[in-house]
């Protein structure tokens, strides 16, 4: 069999190959390496005049409008710094609706007219670029002949040097008509909306002119590493990102021995190399470890501003793939590359606050007495409850559908885990008023030489899609290969709407003469009474929870096609329009784009699945059938009665495979109708046909 030969060659090559590539920090301490390729605050201060630096810093920290007069000075300083570090080109980096990174490189070099050249970078080139807007997904916003689009410098996300020769400038990407064609623009708008509404609430608590409120994020990235020789032997992995065929291995993850196990030397060398590259880019990766499935690992950073965290997450995925090639690996970010073992998610840790008031989701030791925390926490609960379908839509994709709802990832039902302490506090509020908080206490292990451990007031719940974990919420349903900007846009905007609701109610109550504390207690009780059904502290994997969620009226949107319908709901359209995050046209364009991406992803799987089944699996099965038939004939010619059970079973299976291939080809030939019709056909016809072929193979 061809497949077996290729596999044997791959195994032999790996076994006979060199040992793991060793990597170190080249003798440079991590803190000295950190940010060396970033034009961050220290470099700005060193290269810019004081007044220009102060003006730029004010824009970055306070959200003030950028002064166009300083653009040329900043551009020149940025160019000089980049050239001194070996850069020859610059690029406006943006994040189109493909979910990937886009960039076009332009040289600093300009002919001087006398046979020589000089380097040049103007303020205009820094602030604005003009890529072709018709060649990216636009969902109808741009026609093929309407090509003009603009990139605009995002001053809040620092420029950096990538691969030693290109100055990369993070930018927003909009059409000639000003409509957002990317993931950064609505994220920045949503952060602005959250800030405005959070400021209103803080002022009610006596904070006059509080600093800008920023949402923070940190994404725990799971991934698989596969030797490149195995990867290129699998056309399905190459084209679809996941294996469409394959038997369950004799040993998978059932021994639970891979999670947090000793990191293999070759993998550790890769991790160290990857971290070194990320440190240079100013990305504060913190943890690394084995994940649950064989060949699966995780890297996680420290919290950053949501905008920078989103940019950095794109860089993390790019760097992971690049560095993997150096070590003979391929890095897989698909949510479910292998059936039968865990897939890869990206837990997004989320909070918001500022340097003055701190983390607004910090409960303190006595959360029942922390009215400010309870108000902001209740805003999050209300947001998840009211816009659960939208939150589910924000992480919808063909690949993530394979992961959600299995006993490895949270279900598609959006619920909130609060933990014992907070659940008890909110139960008290609903009953008439919170009087106490469960204490944290200490844990004695029973060994004299081991210290007493501070014990948290509640357990963790890994089955919850949206869990409170001490001073932040963790959104666990995000897929391993997805941009985190989509979920962050939804969280920022939905929470802004809840804070708007709360601020409006409290402002009116105070103006009418009601004491603030009494108004808060009354409003919190109302919010929990109306939205407490979204709180669930139990086992999200259990069938009982699915039945209970249905009783509570919580939506269970199992597929992307079901989930994306939320983007067309009037209340969602109104939400994004009211807070100037997405216009109705911009929102509808995303609905069309995400449906189209779903259709295209499954179409690729259908095509490569059909090809593999017809050209690799079926021929091998027919050869095996012939060998069995020839063996039976030889036994019969010897005057004996052959046992044909194996031949009959293989013949039956070949029949199932042949009919399955025909059904898969027929399903793939479907054309016509709207994008929604095509998506439904892919869900209802193509995917079942593909699974049938896999089972037969």
Annotate each PLM feature.
Residues 29-40, 59-61, 178, 250-259:
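Gly-rich Lys/Arg/Thr-decorated short loops/hinges at beta-loop-alpha junctions or inter-strand turns
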Residues 60, 112, 279, 321, ...:
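Anion (oxyanion) recognition and catalysis
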Residues 527-697:
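C-terminal amphipathic alpha-helical interaction region
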Residues 99-115, 134, 139, 234-236, ...:
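Short linear, low-complexity motifs centered on an aromatic residue
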Residues 1-27, 144-152, 156-161, 166:
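N-terminal hydrophobic targeting/anchoring segments and the immediately downstream early-domain regions
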Residues 10-15, 24-44, 192, 196, ...:
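Flexible inter-domain linker/hinge segments
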Residues 33-146:
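Active-site core of metal-dependent hydrolases
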Residues 147-333, 338-594:
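Glycine-rich, acidic/polar active-site loops that bind/position phosphate-bearing ligands
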């Amino acid at each position: 069999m061809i497949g077996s030969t290729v596999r044997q060659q791959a195994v032999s090559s790996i076994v006979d190959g060199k040992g793991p590539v060793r990597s170190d920090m080249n003798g440079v301490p991590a803190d000295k390496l950190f940010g060396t390729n970033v034009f961050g605050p220290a470099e700005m201060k060193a290269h810019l005049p004081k007044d220009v630096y102060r003006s730029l810093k004010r824009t970055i920290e306070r959200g003030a409008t950028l002064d166009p007069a300083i653009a040329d000075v900043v551009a020149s300083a940025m160019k000089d710094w980049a050239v001194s570090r070996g850069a020859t080109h610059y690029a406006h980096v943006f994040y189109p609706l493909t979910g990937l990174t886009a960039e076009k490189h332009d040289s600093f070099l300009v002919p001087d007219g006398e046979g020589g050249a000089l380097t040049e970078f103007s303020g205009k080139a820094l602030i604005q670029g003009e890529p072709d807007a018709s060649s990216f997904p636009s969902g109808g916003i741009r026609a093929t002949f309407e090509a003009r689009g603009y990139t605009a410098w995002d001053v809040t996300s620092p420029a950096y040097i990538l691969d030693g020769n290109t100055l990369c400038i993070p930018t927003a990407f909009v059409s000639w008509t000003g409509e957002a064609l990317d993931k950064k623009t609505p994220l920045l708008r949503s952060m602005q909306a959250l800030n405005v509404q959070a400021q209103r609430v803080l002022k009610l608590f006596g904070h006059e002119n509080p600093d800008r409120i920023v949402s923070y994020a940190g994404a725990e990235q799971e991934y698989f590493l596969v030797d490149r020789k195995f990867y290129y032997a699998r056309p399905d992995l190459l084209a679809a990102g996941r294996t469409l065929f394959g038997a369950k291995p004799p040993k998978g993850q059932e021994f639970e021995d891979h999670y947090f196990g000793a990191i293999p030397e070759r993998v550790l060398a890769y991790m160290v190399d990857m971290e070194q590259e990320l440190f240079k880019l100013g990305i504060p990766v913190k943890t690394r470890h084995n994940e649950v499935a064989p060949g699966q690992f995780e890297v996680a950073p420290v919290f950053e501003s949501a905008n920078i965290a989103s940019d950095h997450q794109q860089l993390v995925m790019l760097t992971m793939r690049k560095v993997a090639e150096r070590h003979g690996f391929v890095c897989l970010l698909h949510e479910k590359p292998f059936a039968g073992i865990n897939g890869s998610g990206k837990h997004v840790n989320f909070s918001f606050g500022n340097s003055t008031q701190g983390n607004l989701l910090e409960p303190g030791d006595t959360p029942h007495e922390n009215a400010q925390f309870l108000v902001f926490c209740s805003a999050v609960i209300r947001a998840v409850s009211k816009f659960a379908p939208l939150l589910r839509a924000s992480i919808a994709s063909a690949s993530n559908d394979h992961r959600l709802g299995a006993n490895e990832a949270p279900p598609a039902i959006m619920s909130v885990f609060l933990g014992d302490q907070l659940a008890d506090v909110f139960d008290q509020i609903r009953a008439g008023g919170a009087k106490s908080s469960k204490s944290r206490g200490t844990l004695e292990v029973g060994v004299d030489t081991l210290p007493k451990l501070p014990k948290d007031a509640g357990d963790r719940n890994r089955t919850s899609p949206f869990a409170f974990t001490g001073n932040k919420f963790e959104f666990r349903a995000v897929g391993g290969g997805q941009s985190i900007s989509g979920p962050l846009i939804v969280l920022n905007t939905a929470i802004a709407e809840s804070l708007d609701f709360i601020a409006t109610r409290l402002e009116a109550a105070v103006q009418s003469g009601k004491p603030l504390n009494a108004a808060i207690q009354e409003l919190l009780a109302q919010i929990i009474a109306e939205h407490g059904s979204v709180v669930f502290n139990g086992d999200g994997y259990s069938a009982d929870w699915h039945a209970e969620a249905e009783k509570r009226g919580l939506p269970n949107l199992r597929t992307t096609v079901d989930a994306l319908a939320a983007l067309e709901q009037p209340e969602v359209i109104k939400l994004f329009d009211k807070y100037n995050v997405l216009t109705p046209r911009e929102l509808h364009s995303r609905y069309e784009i995400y449906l189209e991406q779903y259709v295209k992803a499954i179409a690729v799987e259908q095509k490569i699945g059909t090809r593999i089944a017809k050209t690799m699996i079926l021929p091998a099965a027919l050869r095996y059938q012939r060998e069995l038939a020839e063996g039976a004939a030889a036994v019969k010619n010897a005057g004996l009665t052959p046992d044909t059970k194996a031949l009959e079973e293989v013949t039956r299976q070949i029949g199932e495979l042949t009919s399955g291939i025909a059904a898969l080809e027929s399903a793939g030939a479907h054309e016509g109708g709207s994008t929604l019709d095509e998506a439904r056909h892919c869900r209802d016809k193509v995917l079942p046909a593909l699974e049938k072929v896999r089972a037969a193979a």
